[in-house]
Design a protein with these regions (language model features):
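Acidic, metal/ion-coordinating pockets
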Residues: 1-170
């Protein structure tokens, strides 16, 4: 793990993060929101195993995230790097929505993933909008994401914020 606040490596594992999250849940109860911002499918030997060796079982990363009770996830470029079969299997195993407002299915013109999730905590309506870098085509071979398009994040945010304000009224 990496601490983006201190910009230093963070010694630990998902087990350590789970212990931290459980402690926070004791304090904040149902008001705690647990999100993943992507790239869960790379960097660990266990992820590699379920990405490329055991391609039939439910993906361990999804199983761990389900156990930890994530509220929502987001696609990262390293998740796309594993290829459609792997990341679609991971998404389909998750008990929570994996978001991607700017990941467009080219056959339908619609988002490949749910664009956002609505939650209510302590009487406050919260909307989580998920997006991925649109640089995927410049970074990764098309065979990894064939049938998808990655739209501009700013334009996508404007579009979906209008829809969210009108439809969800957060």
């Amino acid at each position: 793990p990496y601490n983006f606040i201190t910009r230093k490596d963070w010694q630990g594992s998902l087990a350590r993060i789970y212990a931290f999250v459980q402690k926070e849940r004791e304090q904040y109860k149902e008001n705690l929101i647990l999100l993943d911002n992507g790239d869960i499918l790379q960097g660990q030997p266990t992820a590699y195993y379920y990405n490329y060796i055991d391609t039939v079982s439910p993906h361990l990363c999804a199983e761990m995230m389900n156990y930890m009770k994530y509220d929502a996830g987001n696609m990262g470029n390293h998740d796309v790097e594993t290829g459609r079969a792997v990341f679609d299997r991971w998404i389909n195993t998750c008990d929570f929505p994996v978001l991607g407002a700017n990941i467009i299915d080219t056959s339908t013109g619609e988002p490949h993933l749910p664009p956002y999730k609505v939650m209510e905590r302590d009487g406050v309506k919260i909307v989580i909008l998920g997006m991925i870098t649109p640089a995927i085509p410049a970074w990764l071979s098309e065979n990894l994401w064939k049938g998808l398009r990655f739209d501009d994040m700013e334009e996508t945010a404007r579009k979906w914020m209008k829809i969210i304000r009108e439809k969800e009224n957060p």
